[in-house]
Amino acid sequence: MSTPIEAAWQLAKTRYAGLNIDVEAALKQLDQIPVSMHCWQGDDVAGFENTGGPLTGGIQATGNYPGKASTPDELRADLEQAFALIPGPKRLNLHAIYLESAQPVARNEIAPEHFSNWVAWAKRHQLGLDFNPTCFSHPLSADGFTLSHPDEKVRRFWIEHCQASRRISAYFGRELGTPSVMNIWVPDGMKDLTIDRLAFRQRLLSALDEVIAEPLDQTHHIDAVESKLFGIGAESFTVGSSEFCLGYAASRGTALCLDAGHFHPTEVISDKISSAILYVPRLLLHVSRPVRWDSDHVVLLDDETQAIAHEIIRHQLLNRVHIGLDFFDASINRIAAWVIGTRNMKKALLRALLEPTETLRKLEQNGDYTARLALLEEQKSLPWQAVWEHYCQRHDVIPGSEWLQQVRQYEETILTQRQG
């Protein structure tokens, strides 16, 4: 006797077959698309340097939900709990401040040995790792500048930090057999009117050239640069603007990172993918949810998340676009935040894979925009949820909202025992 989920799955296959959509092929392709989940949702971007300093760089984690991770083992345990509730392939994105060392380590002296536990853990769980230098929350970034700093000594420190980070990233890729994407984002900018914008950008250009000068095997490591419109305390001028980073990636052959919250509120990165990909070899996406500013709310299955997935799938860009998430909400259960956001990204990818894209494309090419719109809207009502639930069961993952019960149980037995 079939279960309701199995019965719905069989009906869904029949419905989609009527539109010439191979559901099995879609699920097979979904199994080839990893989503890189960010570690910093688990501890509000605190890291393990244990300096006691505040989060800086024009970003904020708001809320004080109990039970956040404060040690590497706690964070890994929380990640395992989240991963168990997310179907399909996954990666983990680490920042440099998540190193492990018995003694304090200067950021320009970090080395692969400080991340060996993460690599061993990733091997056990069949995960790829991605990386980021951490150019904020540090005394030498307190005045708002790092790689573009006018003081050569300060600038040198951050150049060395990014160079060390690249070697760690390459170590990840070498050990795990999948390239690590290392994204460089700097908070450099000014609160008020800036006279010599060119000098700051010339210094950033030169510094980045030094950072990426060491040749590294691209099967192990991929460089990316990320722009931003503004941050708290850098409202008037951001050195690494969109034009700067696009120009840098295009001229140096790096990947370009598009963060959903790093542009003007009326802009969306889904519209930028098909333009930027014409000029850069790869894109890194930071899928997020900006609410009036770069607030990094948990990703929803909303129009923009769906549009991002459509752009990747419609244009067959999976081999050139790396999908990562970037949000941190300290007002709700942090494990639930991971699960909600990552499942939503995967749901959006599944829906994109189930779209009758070739039919829609032919309608567009023939100028039949009436039929294009009608079909676009009607296919939203197709039974993709039945396919999703079947996919979850294939991966031994709870298909519906019942996963929250596991999170609540973990919260009661583990998170409530933590201090702070």
From Swiss-Prot:
Alphabetized Pfam families for the sequence: RhaA
- EC number assigned by the record: 5.3.1.14
| UniProt entry keywords in alphabetical sequence | Cytoplasm, Isomerase, Manganese, Metal-binding, Rhamnose metabolism
Task: Report the InterPro entries cross-referenced here.
Answer: L-rhamnose_isomerase, Rhamnose_isomerase, Xyl_isomerase-like_sf
Q: Which pathway does it operate in?
A: Carbohydrate degradation; L-rhamnose degradation; glycerone phosphate from L-rhamnose: step 1/3
Which processes are annotated in GO (biological process)?
L-lyxose metabolic process; rhamnose catabolic process
| GO MF term (any one) | manganese ion binding
Q: Give the co-factor note.
A: Binds 1 Mn(2+) ion per subunit.
Catalysed conversion reaction: L-rhamnopyranose = L-rhamnulose
Q: One GO term of the cellular component aspect?
A: cytoplasm
The record's Gene3D superfamilies line, in alphabetical order, gives: Divalent-metal-dependent TIM barrel enzymes
Necessary cofactors? Mn(2+)
For whether the record's keyword set contains Oxidoreductase, the answer is: no
Instruction: Name its cellular compartments.
Output: Cytoplasm
Q: Which residues bind Mn(2+)?
A: H262, D294, D296
* Keyword check for Metal-binding: yes
User: What is the recorded function of this protein according to its Swiss-Prot or TrEMBL entry?
Assistant: Catalyzes the interconversion of L-rhamnose and L-rhamnulose.
How would you summarize the oligomeric state and partners of this protein? Homotetramer.
NCBIfam families with a match to the protein in the record:
PRK01076.1, rhaA
UniProt cross-references to HAMAP family, sorted A to Z: RhaA
Describe the family membership recorded for this protein in Swiss-Prot or TrEMBL. Answer: Belongs to the rhamnose isomerase family.
Protein name in UniProt = L-rhamnose isomerase
Species this chain originates from: Pectobacterium atrosepticum (strain SCRI 1043 / ATCC BAA-672) (Erwinia carotovora subsp. atroseptica)
The encoding gene is: rhaA
